Regions:
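Sec-dependent N-terminal signal peptides of Gram-positive bacterial secreted proteins and lipoproteins
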Residues: 2-38
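Compositionally biased intrinsically disordered regions enriched in Thr/Gly
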Residues: 3, 33-90, 105-108, 112-366
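N-terminal functional modules and adjacent low-complexity/disordered segments of proteins
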Residues: 14, 18-22, 45, 98, ...
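Active-site beta-strand termini and strand-to-loop segments that position acidic
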Residues: 92-96
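Glycan-recognition/cleft segments
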Residues: 97-104
Length: 366
């Protein structure tokens, strides 16, 4: 039977949510991002290698993030994009996925797998919508790379497991404090027993988290109501508890994902707790970090060395020296080409740096 990992805490401070940002490609920057472009951004021709075929596409590069014109995705990747002028919404469909971008808000709202997700805002310029390429395409089932020597962005369609991911949700009743937890359920996989085991575990985890979150915000709402009653000039925003998942790896009979649970109980901002799970779909069991690292006996040293190199290169500013990952219970998830080790906000970093993530390529464990 699978058991959830205990939540780790390095300090007494609890992790707080940071605004999600698209992972940057190593392309020169030209300006600061402006969602609905009030100033013209430089549109450049960028060479892409799409499943081995080279093509030049319109691109905007801002502060290390590459934005791609959505219109070019219709012919180049076979994705279907359309724009609804009435709702000011862009719809991107392909690989059994749909993403909706709501351009009516000052900062673009993204909806994926029936969930609202957060990322760098889209740019609208000269009638064309530009999206952060990595943020968009990794969610649509593509691997992204960058060849600095050739100055070429690589896009490869990922050969995924033959299954379907469905979004289920747990929602509070009318008149109750806001609870909305999304969680994935797998269907169509060949091994139905393993699939049922994974689904039961994910459902149980979501139910437990939703119940605990509901209790937490109910207590907070009661305290907030009392505080407002004592001070008529005080207004505290409504409390809430949300869970949003992202499948990060669906290959080679493995499934990896994380759920970000966000709790707002009043104050300047809320708290996020990330729970990651990696499954062997042939057994329905969770994989350990060492399992994911190809069983390497020295996996801790390999990961520590990679993290330290990334820190030396300025990836994050740790508030205390990094010594080693937690050998007993280190948080991680998989992506197309790497194991991603992560730490909670305030575990090593200040709030503004969000959840520190350190990708370690699979090739490091060969």
């Amino acid at each position: 039977m699978m058991r959830p990992k205990p939540v780790k805490k390095r300090s007494k401070k609890t992790p707080m949510i940071a605004l999600a940002a698209a992972i940057a490609l190593s392309v020169p920057a030209v300006a600061a991002p402006i969602p609905q472009a009030s100033a013209q951004h430089l549109v450049q021709t960028q060479t892409y290698a799409i499943d081995g075929t080279r093509v030049d596409l319109p691109t905007i590069n801002i502060d290390g993030t590459t934005y791609i014109g959505l219109r070019s995705l219709n012919t180049s990747l076979g994705l279907n994009t359309n724009y609804s002028p009435i709702n000011r919404e862009v719809h991107v469909e392909g690989n059994n996925r749909t993403m909706t971008i709501d351009l009516s808000e000052p900062v673009s709202a993204y909806f994926f797998n029936d969930q609202r997700v957060y990322g760098m805002s889209a740019i609208v310029q000269d009638g064309t919508t530009y999206m952060p390429v990595r943020f968009l395409l990794e969610r649509m089932g593509y691997g992204i790379s960058y060849d600095a020597a050739a100055k070429t962005v690589g896009i490869t369609q990922i050969q995924e497991n033959d299954l379907t991911i469905e979004t289920h949700k747990i929602e509070s009743g009318e008149g109750e404090p806001h609870v909305l937890v999304h969680y994935p359920q797998v269907s169509g996989y060949a091994d139905e027993e393993a699939q049922a085991s994974v689904n039961a575990f994910l459902k149980e985890q979501a139910e437990q988290r939703a119940a605990a979150g509901a209790e937490e915000i109910a207590r907070a709402q009661s305290e907030n109501d009392a505080a407002e009653a004592d001070n008529p000039d005080l207004t505290i925003p409504p409390v809430s508890f949300d869970g949003t998942y992202l499948v990060t790896y669906n290959e080679q009979d493995k499934l990896s994902l994380y759920v970000d649970y966000y709790s707002y109980t009043g104050g300047a901002h809320g708290i996020t707790d990330r729970a990651a799970y990696t499954f062997d779909l042939t057994t329905g069991e969770q994989l350990s970090l060492q399992d994911a690292a190809n069983g390497r006996a020295d996996y801790v040293e390999v990961i520590n060395d990679s993290i330290q190199r990334q820190l030396d290169a300025g990836a994050y500013h740790f508030m205390e020296p990094f010594e080693s990952i937690d050998t007993a219970d280190q948080n991680f998830f998989l992506k197309h080409d790497a194991i991603v080790v992560y730490f909670g906000v305030y575990e090593y970093t200040a709030y503004a740096e969000g959840i520190p993530e350190f990708p370690v390529p699979f090739t490091a464990f060969e």
